Structures are given as structure tokens and as C-alpha cells.
UniProtKB/Swiss-Prot annotation:
Belongs to the RecA family. Keywords: ATP-binding, Cytoplasm, DNA damage, DNA recombination, DNA repair, DNA-binding, Nucleotide-binding, SOS response. It comes from the Bacteria. One of its GO terms (molecular function) is damaged DNA binding. It comes from Enterococcus mundtii. ATP binds at residues 65-72. InterPro entries: AAA+_ATPase, DNA_recomb/repair_RecA, DNA_recomb/repair_RecA_CS, P-loop_NTPase, RecA-like_C, RecA-like_N, RecA_ATP-bd, RecA_C_sf. It is found in: Cytoplasm. The keyword rRNA-binding does not apply. SMART domains: AAA. GO terms for cellular component: cytosol. This is Protein RecA. GO terms for biological process: DNA recombination; DNA repair; SOS response.
Length: 346
């Protein structure tokens, strides 16, 4: 009886593989490589908070938060990292608000960046689907979900009711996109805004537009919020920003990365590296002085940041030590043709 069941199962597996291709079904123990391929986020503190050293390939990421909190900055840093490693990036600018000069200062190669400014939500998501399905794009950023306006709303009159249209659009698009994103190992970053529910007396009244589908399909959800202003004398030069990993299917969630987002420059890698090195006693802080290997590198945090910026060899050395101390190592980037398809989480 057991032999008959095994023979029937073998026959069914062969038929499935014949119809849908080799690898369409297998035993989980047969997986050759379960290691998740990643790309750096552009922030060492965020790489640590993510738990795997960067963004996982073949997954959907949602980045949300209040206005001017640094959401697009976080996404542009990811694009810059992909391009540094020879990858191709696309930006679906539904808000029609991308600043090319700012993107360039963050390290984005704007000459090679694929940019689309769609007229409707359907057009934007269809373009994203075409790019992902090609298998030739490493990262697609959609900015933002709230700006993906359904065609019916564009064609309608002001004041017309369009209840649930955007939620249905997102649900339908993500059902289609999720499979091809996983198959082609493309990273899809959806930037989202926040709204407030009317009449909520208890609990958090904040919600993200676009319905619930994105919350379910996203492997990682990042909440970006400004914590405080950074001043140089009386001038405000940036914001201290908290990035909270609200959801994470590939590592423990709820970790927080604190970064300095400097106006016109993006995330200060010197600042976050200095803070993390001090936390792990790699850089010594005594009073206002910072020291590395008995050498003083600056009095005050800003001077220490300037010193590190002027000494890239030392920065690279400290970065390696910090990564080792946090146990994340360098980001893993498995060649696309050598990767096994990883199953999407339920």
C-alpha cells in the first residue's frame, strides 16, 4: 500500500514538472541554497536592523511615514547601492516630484536610472509589471502608493465617490506582481503616505492608503519618522530620523535604526558608523573626544564625522569591524542565474 502511494506521488510530481517546468515542486529539504541574496540599503544601521545585511531580493518592501520624513531618501539610497554593484534600477514617479539633482547627490546615476511618470495608477503598475517580468531590472521603486490614482477617478468629476477603487487596484496588481517579483529576484519598494481615520478614540488612528493588500504582500515594512532637528550653530542642517522595522519575514522585526538625514546630502554614513562603533567599543568616547586605536579623531561628534569623511580607509576598516561585531557580515549577492527560487511566505 505504501509503495502504491509512493508510486502515485512520483507520477504526480513528474506530471507537474512536465507541465510547469523543473523546480515547480520539490521537497523543502532538496533546496540547494537557502541563503537569501541581499543588496545593501545604503545605511549600515538599517542593514543591522533588517537582520540580514540589506534588502532581500525577490521581495516586496513598503516604506511609509509622514510627509518629509525621508521615505524617498531611503529608497534612493537603495537605488544608488544597486547601481554601484552594476545593477539596473527603475523609479515609477507617480507623485511627479523626483528631484534629479538630489538623487545625484545621494549617489544615483541619473543617466542610467529608468524613470516613468505615469498618468494613472493602472499605467504605473503595468509599467512596473513589465519591468519586473523582463528579469533585467534589479530594483523598482514606486513613489507613492497614495499617488496611484485609478483611471476611473482621473476621468471622473471632482467630488465623485470612488470607494475602494484604489484598494482593489492594489490588490489585483500585487496578486500579479508578487509571483514575477519572486521569480526574477527583483526588489520592489513601495513608498506610502499615512492618513488618519476619523473618529478613532483609542489606539493609533494612522493608516496607510491603498487597502490591506500591501501590508500582507510586503516581506518588510519600514516606518520612517523624524525624531529631532540637527543644528550647526543656529542653522538647521538635517534631521535625526528613526527607521522602525514594523514587519520582517526574514529576520526578527521591531528593530530601530537611527540615522542622520542631512539636507541635500541624504543619510550620513559617517554619523551612523560613529554611533555604532562607539556602542560596540570599537571607537572610544571619553568626554567630548572620540578616539580610534589610541589616536584622537575629533572633539565632538561633528568633528569626528568630518575626520572619518576625510579618511575613507579608516572608515572602511571601522565598517568591517562594526559589521563583524553586529554579526551581519557583508551583504550577500548571489548571481541571479545561480539562485534557487525562494518560496513566498504565506
Amino acid at each position: 500500500m505504501a509503495d502504491d502511494r509512493k508510486a502515485a506521488l512520483d507520477a504526480a510530481l513528474k506530471k507537474i514538472e512536465k507541465n510547469y517546468g523543473k523546480g515547480s515542486i520539490m521537497k523543502l529539504g532538496e533546496k540547494i541554497d537557502q541563503q537569501i541574496s541581499t543588496i545593501p540599503s545604503g545605511s549600515l544601521a538599517l542593514d543591522v536592523a533588517l537582520g540580514i545585511g540589506g534588502y532581500p531580493r525577490g521581495r516586496i518592501i513598503e516604506v511609509y511615514g509622514p510627509e518629509s520624513s525621508g521615505k524617498t531618501t531611503v529608497a534612493l539610497h537603495a537605488i544608488a547601492e544597486v547601481q554601484k554593484n552594476g545593477g539596473t534600477a527603475a523609479f515609477i514617479d507617480a507623485e511627479h516630484a523626483l528631484d534629479p539633482q538630489y538623487a545625484q547627490k545621494l549617489g544615483v546615476n541619473i543617466d542610467e536610472l529608468l524613470l516613468s511618470q505615469p498618468d494613472t495608477g493602472e499605467q504605473g503598475l503595468e509599467i512596473a509589471d513589465a519591468l519586473v517580468s523582463s528579469g533585467a531590472v534589479d530594483i523598482v521603486v514606486i513613489d507613492s502608493v497614495a499617488a496611484l490614482v485609478p483611471r476611473a477617478e482621473i476621468d471622473g468629476e471632482m467630488g465623485d465617490s470612488h470607494v475602494g477603487l484604489q484598494a482593489r487596484l492594489m490588490s489585483q496588481a500585487l496578486r500579479k506582481l508578487s509571483g514575477s517579483i519572486n521569480k526574477t529576484k527583483t526588489i520592489a519598494i513601495f513608498i506610502n503616505q499615512i492618513r488618519e481615520k476619523v473618529g478613532v478614540m483609542f489606539g493609533n488612528p494612522e493608516i496607510t492608503p491603498g487597502g490591506r493588500a500591501l501590508k500582507f504582500y510586503a516581506t518588510i515594512r519600514l516606518e520612517v519618522r523624524r525624531a529631532e532637528q540637527l543644528k550647526q550653530g543656529t542653522d538647521i542642517v538635517g534631521n535625526r530620523t528613526k527607521i522602525k522595522v514594523v514587519k520582517n519575514k526574514v529576520a526578527p522585526p521591531f528593530k530601530i535604526a537611527e540615522v542622520d538625514v542631512m539636507y541635500g546630502l541624504g543619510i550620513s554614513q559617517e554619523g551612523e558608523l560613529l554611533d555604532m562603533a562607539v556602542e560596540k567599543d570599537i571607537v572610544d568616547k571619553s568626554g567630548a573626544w572620540y578616539s580610534y586605536k589610541e589616536d584622537r579623531i575629533g572633539q565632538g561628534r561633528e568633528n569626528a564625522k568630518i575626520y572619518m569623511s576625510n579618511h575613507p580607509e579608516m572608515m572602511a576598516e571601522v565598517s568591517t569591524l562594526v559589521r563583524a561585531a553586529y554579526g551581519i557580515g557583508e551583504p550577500v549577492d548571489v548571481p541571479q542565474e545561480a539562485q534557487e527560487e525562494l518560496p513566498l511566505d504565506e
